[in-house]
């Protein structure tokens, strides 16, 4: 049973890898229901998931999932501990948390650009995930981890792309670049370039003024010394002339 289960997982992974760019490390988004099922089945996720998927994995969750487990109380305390050990991915609900299922759906929205796996026991969430092509779905059944086969919507999408009826991933990227060039989509790289251009400038006029003031200050004491020396010489000549006049008299 274990060998056939791994064969199915290898086949499904190959499908998602070839058609949707899924690659290692496999990023698996866990919700509270999956953590609770792993706790009841005594499944060591960090050990068993890499063996089952035959590759490096990263266990991930979101702040909304952690907040949901925290509000549910002591009954899901063990599941909360499992989720807290996962890497927390940033979600758009930092100020106003939503339910765990809604949050995970938002993480795989717009074509699942980060190639997340969704691991859940929630049937409603599973149905919604299957409606979006290209999202690997995982669940636990009879204390064993299972990677679900590609959904009918996913298979139909791949066939339509191969037949030329839908836009492929590469074409979507080129369309996005054109929109960025026309200013329809904000490009973070352009922002960085603009910021760099603003930083480049001429010398600060205030610094130039300070330098001139310093130069004037250095000249002023020298001129005062010269004037003092001239006065001293005049006084000495007057003394000599007075002494000569006294001697003649």
From Swiss-Prot:
GO terms under cellular component:
nucleolus; small-subunit processome
- Location relative to the cell: Nucleus, Nucleolus
> Which stretches are tagged as biased composition: Polar residues?
237-249
Q: What are the record keywords, sorted? A: Isopeptide bond, Nucleus, Phosphoprotein, Ribosome biogenesis, rRNA processing, Ubl conjugation
Q: Which InterPro entries match?
A: Fcf1/Utp23 (IPR006984), PIN-like_dom_sf (IPR029060)
CDD domains referenced in this protein's UniProt entry, alphabetically? PIN_Fcf1-Utp23-H
Family statement: Belongs to the UTP23/FCF1 family. UTP23 subfamily.
**Protein name (record):** rRNA-processing protein UTP23 homolog
The lineage is: Eukaryota, Metazoa, Chordata, Craniata, Vertebrata
